Amino acid sequence: MSAEYYFNLGNAYYRSGKKGKAILCYERALRLNPRYEKAQANLDFVNMKIIDRPEPEENILAVGFRNVQNAMSPTAWTVVAMAAFLLSIAGMAAYAFASAITLRKVGFFGGLGLLVVCVFANVFAARANNAATSHDYAVVMNDSTQLSAVSREPLNKDEVAFTLHEGAKLKKNDSIRIDGNVKNTWYKVQTADNREAWIKASAIEEI
């Protein structure tokens, strides 16, 4: 499926009142194409309409790092890393073998700088690839669901951790299948504000 397919499907779901499905589709579109501005704009819009609104990210450094990471695909970052590495070797070779002082200085500092570029490009490539292929995140599909403090249905109010609503995005950290029954799978999840609890698999859908 393409990012455009999920974008259009998300629009259709939103028009039919299914905000959770719409958010899921926009998230999938952005996983395939992190630079899809229309999908990001629509996701931000629908997120403003749900009960459990995600808080805006305030860490400027983290936002900038992610924006640079999303500037290119994992493949493109890998090409940049390889090119920077080869050029850094050429720079070091110039430093080692050139007779002119100026050329040696350019080779040394240029090679060192390109080596730093190589390291960062590899980091961006790995992170971008992980973002595109991982299945660690999910969206709540139920209108309302109680999360449990234990890895099963809460038996009393003391075992209810908190309640989430349709459209909330979660990170899956662990899972357990009770009695080997796939229909009784529970995920340990983390919310955007770092709360942790258990939720039944049937209440969420994987991005």
Short names for language-model regions:
Residues 19, 105-145, 152-159, 171-173, ...:
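Boundary regions of SH3-family modules and the immediately adjacent low-complexity/disordered segments
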Residues 52, 57-97:
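Membrane-embedded alpha-helical segments of integral membrane proteins
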